[in-house]
Amino acid sequence: DWLRKRHLSDTSQRGDNRFVRVSWDEALDMFYEELERVQKTHGPSALLTASGWQSTGMFHNASGMLAKAIALHGNSVGTGGDYSTGAAQVILPRVVGSMEVYEQQTSWPLVLQNSKTIVLWGSDLLKNQQANWWCPDHDVYEYYEQLKAKVAAGEIEVISIDPVVTSTHEYLGREHVKHIAVNPQTDVPLQLALAYTLYSENLYDKNFLANYCVGFEQFLPYLLGEKDGQPKDAAWAEKLTGIDAETIRGLARQMAANRTQIIAGWCVQRMQHGEQWAWMIVVLAAMLGQIGLPGGGFGFGWHYNGAGTPGRKGVILSGFSGSTSIPPVHDNSDYKGYSSTIPIARFIDAILEPGKVINWNGKSVKLPPLKMCIFAGTN
């Protein structure tokens, strides 16, 4: 029905129609005709240009090529953030000064040489390093082999904080890895209880907090329960997390006793209020006072892009820019009071509730009335 009537078709049939094969020439003509119609009739606030991850390589970059192609035609609604790290990449610049999730991680040789405890918090290195933003070379796996040998020899202890047994946990050996099977979405109570133990047992680094951090005195009253009457101790967290209180205290003591590398993944920050978890990872690392020391501190990108392999000095070719200096076919820049950029995961909200005002990254966003959504490199 849509092939015959386009935007005048019966939308009640949407999702029930059979697949109809057309030639590439027909498909491209239909796409451009609809692009023209929406741009001329409704303007840029009705067009969404969105991408997810990319195809491997710099030229076949879905997001860049789509942005360039649509920019040659006219303005559209863009997207901000990404599906991978939507919460962490917003909060961490305000906490540590950079996005952190895509930063270079401490090299594995330094970790293997200096770390005594590695905490995998929602991070499955073995599974996720199969993919890569560039062309995966899997060099990092040789360091996982070295880690496995050191774990088996008792030189490094690995603790996995995860509701499930991950591929990395299985690879390193169930008999060697300590599993903290936290209840889903209760990671922050566990973090608070660890922080409470570090503070109450005087295991935290006062000098590091005094010299390199700000705001601990604002965090402390909440941690101690001075405002709500509930100390965030291990006994409190046990009821929420499903983790025995003494296990929580023991974990805090172990992390403070020697050089501890916190390896945080991205999955936990995708839950509701996930930015609090990312923030608390930094709080714990700061209380331990090991940020900047070899084999200590925290990182959020160890499972990605061969992280931890020593960097190369060679030049990396940049990709094609999504912008263009060529004047577009249509120069309409009137978004009619709607936002020109929306969070990438909120396009469904824009379709269902156009005009709704939401908060995002400290700003108000007015969702536009979308009539056409153009996706490339996403599912």
Model-derived segments and their meaning:
Residues 1-203, 332-333, 347, 363, ...:
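N-terminal export/assembly segments and adjacent metallocofactor-ligating motifs
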Residues 50-58, 236-240, 265-273, 304-306, ...:
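Conserved short loop/turn motifs at secondary-structure junctions
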Residues 247, 366-373:
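Long hydrophobic segments that form regular secondary structure
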Residues 42-46, 204-209, 292-299:
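Flexible, glycine/charged-enriched surface loops at secondary-structure junctions
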Residues 111-114, 118-124, 175, 219-241:
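Conserved thiamine diphosphate
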Residues 43-44, 61, 243-244, 249, ...:
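Gly/Pro-rich turn-and-neighbor structural signature
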Residues 255-361, 366:
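A glycine-rich, hydrophobic/aromatic-adjacent loop/helix-cap motif
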Residues 196, 201-234, 335:
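Scaffold signal of the M16-like zinc-metallopeptidase fold and its non-catalytic homologs
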